Amino acid sequence: MLLDESKFDLQLKLWALRIPSQLCKVASRILNGYLLDKPRVKPITEDPTCETNRYIILSERIKNPDLSDIPEDKRDELKVLCKIEVVPYSLTLGYSYWSADHVLKQILPDGVEVPSSFETITFSLCHIAHLNITGELLPYKDVIAKVIYDKNYPRIKTVVNKVGTITNEFRVPKFEILVGKDDMVTEVKQYRATFKLDYSLVYWNSRLEHEHMRLVSQFRPGQIICDMFSGVGPFAIPAAQKGCLVYANDLNPDSIRYLKINAKINKVDDNIWAYNMDARKFISQLMEVPVHEILPEPDVPVLKATEECSIQANVQTESQNGGLTVEAIGVHSDDSSNMDGIEGSCTVADDTVAAVKKHSGSCEEENGTYDNATVSVVGRRKDRMNKRMRGSESSSNIKPWEHVDHVIMNLPASAIQFLDAFRGLIQRKYWKGSLPWIHCYCFIRANETNEMIISEAETALNASIQEPILHRVRDVAPNKAMFCLSFRLSEEACFKEDATKSLLDSSGDL
C-alpha cells in the first residue's frame, strides 16, 4: 500500500490583519480568543509584501472582512491602535502537519484499530520504534512504519516489527526493519543511568523503568545484591549507583558484554561482578565455600601442608574440567596479598572459584582459554576503592557465601522454576545475618490465582513461604499480568541440613 501525501492537504480560507510589527503584541492581546488556534501554527506571521509589517491570522470563526464577528469594543480598541487593514489569507495544512494518529485513521479501513503509542508502539528507545504488528494490521505494516518514521524523525531513525514469538534461549525477539537505517545499537536513559545496547541481540523493555526503580529503592548502600537474570543491567546499574555490591549474571554473552560497557559508562564498574553462565550454576557457585575458607571439623585434624596441596590440586583439576571459569579484567592491587600464604608452597586452591569469591589478583588474565561459562570482574582499578560505596567492608572482603541481602530473578516466563536452586544452597555455619529477600518475577493469567503462584513457588523451593508479597507490575495482555513475588528465604529451604530433612520428610509422606 502506497502513501499519497497530497490526499492529506487541507486548504483553509482565512482573514488576517496587516499591522506594523511593533504593534503585534498589543493587537494580539486585544484579539485574544479570536486568533487562529491550531497546534504548531503561529497566528502571527510575516507579511510577504512588507518587511516592517506582520499578518495576524484570525480564527476560522471570523467569516466577514468587516470583522463584524468580533465584539464592537474590541474593534474600537483596534481602530485606536492603528489603521486596520483586513486581507485574505490562505493556509494549507499538509501531510507534515497531521499527527501519526490522524494519518493512520485516514488510511486504515473502518473497524481496524489504530495502533497507539501505549499498546503497540514503543518510542522510549533512543532512535528505534518497536512495532508489534499482527493480524489484520499486517498488510499495512509498511505504511504504518513510514508514518511513524515520518512523524518522529530525527528522534526515530529505525522502525522495526517483531516477527513471530520468542523461541530462543536468550528471550530476544526477532525483528524485521521496515524503514530507516539498519542500526539496532542505541542508548537508553533511565533516571540517572545510561544503557547502551544492541536491540537485536539483547532483551530490553523500557516500560519496566518504574519497576526497576521501585525495587532498587528497597536496597541500602553497602548491601549485597545478586541478579540472576541481569540482562544489560537495568537493576544492577542503579543498584550499584546506590552503593550496593552487585553480582550480576546472564546466560546471554551479549547481555554481559553490554552490562560491562554500561558499568563503565555509569562509573560503577568497581561495584559489579559480571557472570555469563546458567542461573542455577551461577547461584550454586556463588554460594559455594572455597576450599581455603572451609572450617575444619572439631574432631578432624588440620591437614598438613602437603595434604592440603594435594587436595587443592585435585579441586583445580576438577574446575578445569567444567567448573566455574574466570575472566578477570584487573583487580584492586591490595587483593593479591590475601593469597600470599597459600601461593608460597602450592598451587592456589580452587583457583577458578576462589578468585571470584575473593576477587584476588591471582585470577587469570583476560583473553585466556575458557571451556565453560565466564565471570568478569568489571574494571577493578589499582589503588582505587569506589567512592560511592558506603558499606563498611571493602569489595575485596565480601564473601557471598556468608551473606547476600537481595536476590533478583527477572525472568517472568520461568523464574519460579529456578527457585529449586535455593534448596540446601547455604551452609548454616558460614552464614551471617538474616537470610536474603527473593524477588521473583512471574506472569499470572486471568484463570490463575495468587495462591496458585505462591504454591508453585513453594513446590519449587520444597518449603513454605512466610508472608509473601505480590506486587502487580503491569498488564502485558488483556488476560495476563506481570507480578513480582517477594519473600524472605526460609531456613527450611536454603540451609543444607534443614533442606535435606525437609526433602526426607516430604519423601516419607508419599
UniProtKB/Swiss-Prot annotation:
EC number annotated for this UniProt entry: 2.1.1.228
Lipid biosynthesis in keyword set: no
GO-annotated molecular function: tRNA (guanine(37)-N1)-methyltransferase activity; tRNA methyltransferase activity
Gene Ontology CC entries for this record: cytoplasm; mitochondrial matrix; nucleus
Reactions accelerated catalytically: guanosine(37) in tRNA + S-adenosyl-L-methionine = N(1)-methylguanosine(37) in tRNA + S-adenosyl-L-homocysteine + H(+)
Stated family: Belongs to the class I-like SAM-binding methyltransferase superfamily. TRM5/TYW2 family.
PANTHER family assigned to the protein according to its UniProt record, in alphabetical order: TRNA (GUANINE(37)-N1)-METHYLTRANSFERASE, TRNA METHYLTRANSFERASE
Function: Specifically methylates the N1 position of guanosine-37 in various cytoplasmic and mitochondrial tRNAs. Methylation is not dependent on the nature of the nucleoside 5' of the target nucleoside. This is the first step in the biosynthesis of wybutosine (yW), a modified base adjacent to the anticodon of tRNAs and required for accurate decoding.
Quaternary structure and partners: Monomer.
Name recorded for this polypeptide: tRNA (guanine(37)-N(1))-methyltransferase 2
Organism: Vitis vinifera (Grape)
